[in-house]
Regions:
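ATP/nucleoside-binding phosphotransfer catalytic cores, i.e., glycine-rich phosphate-binding loops
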Residues: 235, 239-302
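Short acidic, glycine-rich surface-loop motifs adjacent to enzyme active sites
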Residues: 76-88, 223-234
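ATP/NTP phosphate-donor binding region
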Residues: 1-71, 240-243, 247, 263, ...
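Short Gly/Thr/Asp-enriched flexible loops that form oxyanion-binding sites at enzyme active sites
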Residues: 81-104, 237-246
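Internal gly/pro-rich beta-alpha loop/helix module
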Residues: 108-177
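Short acidic, glycine/serine/threonine-rich loops at helix termini
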Residues: 17-20, 92-93, 118-121, 151-156, ...
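Buried hydrophobic positions in well-ordered alpha/beta secondary-structure cores of metabolic enzymes
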Residues: 10-11, 80, 129, 146, ...
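Accessory alpha-helical/coil subdomains and C-terminal extensions
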Residues: 2, 7-15, 28-38, 150-236
Length: 302
């Protein structure tokens, strides 16, 4: 029987109502108490790593999560990590890059409603996450609403609906149907040895372009290590900003371009405005989600 480590970090799934609103309070034992059928699926140990609203989760916290997984990888067949949904996409993406070529299943999950409230999605999501981890396929995934999402393609598209997540720019990795794990593609062949990335760079500044953004704004960014421009559509940068972007690049700043669209990616070659941005030296982030691009940049992959 698979032996799984559950790492609890807080989030809505662990929330209780307080005088100041929902706040994480339930520990891993309380969450597991809602899953009597789990004992027939796998054996479980728990680690209560932190108790945070995911809004408060930092890069250092995500490094702690990666370290907890890495330090226990020889002892367990897989991992389930409970997490708040608001920044789950950021955590799934960064863990994908902090643990490249990971050779065990690491499945993140959470819920849009707290455990124990009527019609909560928490019991289903948590049980499905254990099903996915127990299945044994290596990699970093998120399990939400019956869908298994690759960690690098997770996108939260709605702030309240149960069906809040989509797999951006890629088909879901799989799904749970009739309590069984069904994968959409064959397991990938590892392309390297598992490792833990221990050094990250958080000096990355996203700038969301708007139609009337003042070009003078860019002067305060001169020399900043890395800037990600969230551009329009396929990657267009307005002509009136080109001089400011050129100065930014010439100052030594690496400028990357992503899109404000949740899906479709960047295609700088498609329009003249994109080709001009590329000629300035801006770097396309292609079909990466913003969260995945941020994780790759933090880990020095780009």
């Amino acid at each position: 029987m698979p032996h799984i480590l559950m790492i609890a970090t807080g989030g809505t799934i662990a929330c209780c109502e307080t005088a100041h609103g929902l706040s994480p309070a339930l520990d891993s034992a309380a969450l597991l108490g809602a899953l009597p059928e789990l004992s027939a699926l796998c054996t479980v140990e728990t680690l209560d790593l932190m108790q945070l609203d995911s809004t408060d989760v930092t890069a250092a916290d995500r490094q702690r999560m990666a370290q907890a997984v890495w330090q226990n990888r020889e002892k367990f067949d897989g991992f389930v990590l409970t997490h708040g949904t608001d920044t789950l996409a950021y955590t799934a993406a960064l863990l994908t890059h902090l643990l490249p070529h990971f050779d065990k299943p690491l499945v993140l999950t959470g819920s849009m409603l707290p455990m124990g409230v009527p019609d909560s999605d928490a019991p289903r999501n948590l049980l499905d996450a254990f099903r996915t981890a127990a299945d044994g396929r290596a990699g970093v995934y998120a399990m939400m609403n019956g869908q298994i999402l690759h960690g690098s393609h997770v996108f939260k598209q709605h702030s309240t609906k149960i069906d809040a997540f989509l797999s951006a720019n890629a088909a879901p990795a799989g799904e749970i149907r009739e309590s069984e794990v069904h994968w959409n593609t064959p397991a990938s062949v590892p392309s390297g040895e598992p490792q833990l990335v221990e050094q990250i760079d958080t000096h990355i500044l996203p700038v969301r372009l708007t139609p009337d953004l003042d070009p003078s704004f860019f002067s305060v960014l001169l020399g900043y290590p890395k800037v990600v421009l969230e551009a329009f559509g396929a990657g267009g940068v307005p002509a009136r900003l080109e001089s400011a972007v050129r100065d930014l690049i010439q100052s030594g700043t690496r400028v990357y371009i992503t899109t404000q669209c949740p899906e479709g990616g960047v295609h700088l070659h498609k329009y003249e405005v994109g080709r001009r941005a590329e000629a300035l030296g801006a770097i396309s982030l292609g079909s990466r989600t913003f969260e995945d691009a941020l994780g790759a940049l933090m880990c020095g992959e780009l």
